[in-house]
Curated annotation (Swiss-Prot):
<keyword id="KW-1278">Translocase</keyword>
<dbReference type="InterPro" id="IPR027417">
    <property type="entry name" value="P-loop_NTPase"/>
</dbReference>
<dbReference type="InterPro" id="IPR003439">
    <property type="entry name" value="ABC_transporter-like_ATP-bd"/>
</dbReference>
<keyword id="KW-0547">Nucleotide-binding</keyword>
<feature type="domain" description="ABC transporter">
    <location>
        <begin position="12"/>
        <end position="254"/>
    </location>
</feature>
<keyword id="KW-0592">Phosphate transport</keyword>
<keyword id="KW-0813">Transport</keyword>
<dbReference type="Pfam" id="PF00005">
    <property type="entry name" value="ABC_tran"/>
</dbReference>
<comment type="function">
    <text>Part of the ABC transporter complex PstSACB involved in phosphate import. Responsible for energy coupling to the transport system.</text>
</comment>
<dbReference type="GO" id="GO:0005524">
    <property type="term" value="F:ATP binding"/>
</dbReference>
<keyword id="KW-1003">Cell membrane</keyword>
<protein>
    <recommendedName>
        <fullName>Phosphate import ATP-binding protein PstB 2</fullName>
        <ecNumber>7.3.2.1</ecNumber>
    </recommendedName>
</protein>
<dbReference type="InterPro" id="IPR005670">
    <property type="entry name" value="PstB-like"/>
</dbReference>
<dbReference type="InterPro" id="IPR017871">
    <property type="entry name" value="ABC_transporter-like_CS"/>
</dbReference>
<dbReference type="GO" id="GO:0016887">
    <property type="term" value="F:ATP hydrolysis activity"/>
</dbReference>
<comment type="similarity">
    <text>Belongs to the ABC transporter superfamily. Phosphate importer (TC 3.A.1.7) family.</text>
</comment>
<dbReference type="GO" id="GO:0035435">
    <property type="term" value="P:phosphate ion transmembrane transport"/>
</dbReference>
């Protein structure tokens, strides 16, 4: 269940984090703190390591052949890579929304109910109904689908599908939501709705978002971390990063000299 962590307190901490895929090193000695109750944007050119870092947080890299993670990564001070840790429970605490909307081939209702069912979060049907409705409401989708919950989630528009995936993620009461370029496949109107939703969700969740759009990072985040060639170049308040970066590489990326 979600637990209270004072806003701004470090929720996730990486120290000396390295990731190898076989012989290739994807992350080099990353030290990064993710504050609770804020949106942290990870930016940088393609292949810079931002998605690799994101996937370390809920151990999605475990599913990649040849992946090796060294160093320290903690969630509320507990080692994410402790061998005794239940990865299923970790992924309940740390939800994920992917680049392309991926609703299950189930009804809208069952898409959202799936997680609470497998984690035993509802004592009865009425409680499950409440979780589903509340999750759809938080995702800004309930008004659009309330009369057709039995219809397939795959029949929704792209933007609605992505908000359904967000509802599915928050239905298990995560503490952290990871978003890997959640708007890259959406049109501008759907993107605006998701961005508005992110702003609303940060009151209750710690959010880490990977984005190729610097404009999006500036709109939705309070902190921004800039990655380049697998290294963390600079991290700070979003306004400071975009208006007064300290590192020449950051300045070059922000101003479009490379990308």
């Amino acid at each position: 269940m979600n637990q209270f962590i004072p806003r701004g307190t470090s929720k996730i901490s990486a120290r000396g984090l390295n990731v190898h895929y076989g012989e290739k090193q994807a992350l080099h000695d990353i030290d990064l703190d993710i504050p609770a109750g804020e949106v942290t944007a990870l930016i940088g050119p393609s292949g810079c390591g931002k998605s690799t870092f994101l996937r370390c947080i809920n151990r999605m890299n475990d599913m990649v052949d040849g992946a090796k993670v060294t160093g320290s990564l903690t969630l509320d001070g507990s080692d994410v890579y402790d061998r005794s840790l239940d990865v299923v429970q970790l992924r309940a605490r740390v939800g994920m929304v992917f680049q392309k909307p991926n609703p299950f081939p189930k009804s809208i209702y069952d898409n959202v109910a799936y997680g609470p069912r497998i984690h035993g979060l509802a004592r009865d049907q009425a409680e499950l109904d409440e979780i589903v409705m509340n999750s759809l409401e938080k995702a800004g989708l309930l008004a659009e689908v309330e009369s057709r919950l039995s219809e397939s989630g795959t029949g929704l528009s792209g933007g609605q599908q992505q908000r359904l995936c967000i509802a599915r993620a928050i239905a298990v009461a995560p503490e952290v939501i990871l978003m890997d370029e959640p708007c890259s496949a959406l049109d501008p109107i759907a993107t605006a709705k998701v961005e508005e939703l992110i702003d609303e969700l940060r009151d209750n969740y710690t959010i880490v978002i990977v984005t190729h759009s610097m404009q999006q990072a500036a709109r939705v985040s309070q902190r921004t971390a800039f990655f380049h060639l697998g290294k963390l170049i600079e991290v700070g308040g979003t306004e400071e990063i975009f208006t007064n970066p300290k590192e020449p590489l950051t300045q070059g990326y922000i101003t479009g000299r490379f990308g």
